[in-house]
From Swiss-Prot:
InterPro entries: Bifun_inhib/LTP/seed_sf, Bifunc_inhib/LTP/seed_store. Residues 1-29 form the signal peptide. One of its GO terms (cellular component) is plasma membrane. Its main location: membrane. It comes from Arabidopsis thaliana. Pfam families: LTP_2 (PF14368). Disulfide bonds join 39-78, 50-62, 63-102, 76-110. It is found in: Cell membrane. The gene is LTPG27. Probable lipid transfer protein. Residues 138-162 form a propeptide. Keywords: Cell membrane, Disulfide bond, Glycoprotein, GPI-anchor, Lipoprotein, Membrane, Signal. Glycans are attached at residues 68, 124, 135. This is Non-specific lipid transfer protein GPI-anchored 27. It is a lipid-anchor; GPI-anchor.
């Protein structure tokens, strides 16, 4: 076998490792929906009033506030609370029960808001409001897995060489 300089091989392997791990195409910033001031101030109070107390029947204030929010703050309510991961901490059956008892049909409300936004050339959300969490960042998970497998390959090559 030919003589190889172990320092040069180690430096080359380190450069390849850093190029694979630090590739900027694989890192994407997570985007969050933009919140307006009214949404930030109004919606959390409604959610706290309606969903943090384990009642058999929601209060009249809760239902009135929810109905008002579904008419004036549909985008905020759907995008940031009903369809977001922050809302997933609440029991799905409990939250659906509160919305049903308040006679708020959120499944159709969110879909109608999405359709209105697309008709105006606005929102391009691909989520639906069926009380399920839709993850649109699946590609990011695959890129992390690819990066980790590349790291493993480089580590194996280093161990084989030395």
């Amino acid at each position: 076998m030919a003589y190889t300089n172990k320092v040069a091989v180690a430096v080359g392997a380190a450069v390849v490792f850093l190029a694979v791990v630090m590739n900027p195409r694989w890192t994407e910033a997570q985007t969050y929906p933009k919140l307006d001031r009214l949404c930030v101030m109004m919606i959390p109070d409604i959610l706290e009033e309606c969903f943090t107390h384990d009642r058999l029947k929601p209060t009249e204030d809760c239902c009135n506030d929810l109905k008002n929010a579904t008419m004036t703050q549909v985008d905020c309510l759907c995008d940031n609370f009903l369809e977001s991961l922050s809302f997933s901490d609440l029991s799905r059956t409990f939250s659906a029960g509160v919305l049903k008892k308040c006679d708020v049909s959120h499944k159709y409300m969110c879909q109608a808001a999405k359709n209105r936004g697309e008709a105006k050339g606005g929102r391009n959300s691909t989520t639906t409001c069926d009380n399920s969490i839709t993850n649109t960042s699946v590609g990011g998970k695959n890129k992390v897995a690819t990066s980790m497998s590349a790291f493993g390959l480089v580590a194996i090559l280093l161990f084989v060489m030395f």
